[in-house]
């Protein structure tokens, strides 16, 4: 990530002229960044727009990926790819609300630690949004 190097994130990026929808953007970015074949992806919907503290508006796309999956990360964009069980992500016992000082202001953010990995910020916020939505069903 150019704007957030070293952070854990979902594939994603800016809308390009050929993108006809947020799903088209997500599928294109996932193919470019991690080599995910769009034919193996079934888009099931969108989460509400997520606004980051740095001013970005993200439209999270929810999809099911049909196995088997052969990912080929772009080394210029992605250092590592890993999988976290959905049951772990949806378990509120694994969700943390944290506070830090940033540019002289107190900032609250979410985190979902997983083993030696620290999922936080917008990525954790999007995960918690999905968990909240699914808990209502």
Where do the language-model regions lie?
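Unchanged
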Residues: 1, 14-119, 128-137
